[in-house]
Amino acid sequence: MQVNKAGEKMDNLPSEMFENIEPGDDENACTPKIDDNFIGIRINAPDVVYYAPGEKDPNTGHFAKIMICGIRRFRGDFLSELRPDVEKKVALVAIDTQLHNVHTSLLIDDDPDEPDPSPPQFPKETLEKVYITAWFNINILDYLDLPERPATYNVFVTLKEYKSNVVTIKLVEKKTGEAD
């Protein structure tokens, strides 16, 4: 395990582990580990992502696959105040460490034909005792229009006053003839 600047234990996973992760909301081998009294958001990401200039993924149209795997855990009363559209309040942020360009997006995966579900109503006293955990796996290029060039990004996720740990992702151009 690695320790970040705040002294928190962080998973140290090889970049290759993220190659087979698909977008969705499943827990997987790249999901950060949290303890029972954790409240907030944690993310994992590959340290390095390689891309071939001019090549696009036939399914996504993106120049690379930059996966972030995350977990969030909050008290029920906190999430209840954000309902029915919690997802519309989660923000993804990537900051270019050299140029200091900031890229942001809400993690909205809206289907305009699907209305937001009405949340069940529970007494506040009940919600204060309940903790809700959710997982997410996203390709940040589905949300952010990052330029196709070598760069290093500091990436994090926020929800109201909560901010995840910061991960650093380096985009590296594959040289001609280099294997994946």
List the predicted regions and their residue ranges.
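Contiguous segments within soluble domain cores/interaction surfaces
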Residues: 4, 8-11, 15, 39-48, ...
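Proline/serine/threonine-rich low-complexity linkers at boundaries of modular beta-sandwich domains
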Residues: 28-40
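Short Trp-Ser/Thr-centered turn/loop motifs at beta-strand boundaries
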Residues: 133, 150, 159-171
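Low-complexity, Pro/Ser/Thr- and charge-rich linker/hinge segments at domain boundaries
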Residues: 174-180
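Short glycine/proline/serine/threonine-rich loop/turn segments at secondary-structure transition edges
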Residues: 142-152
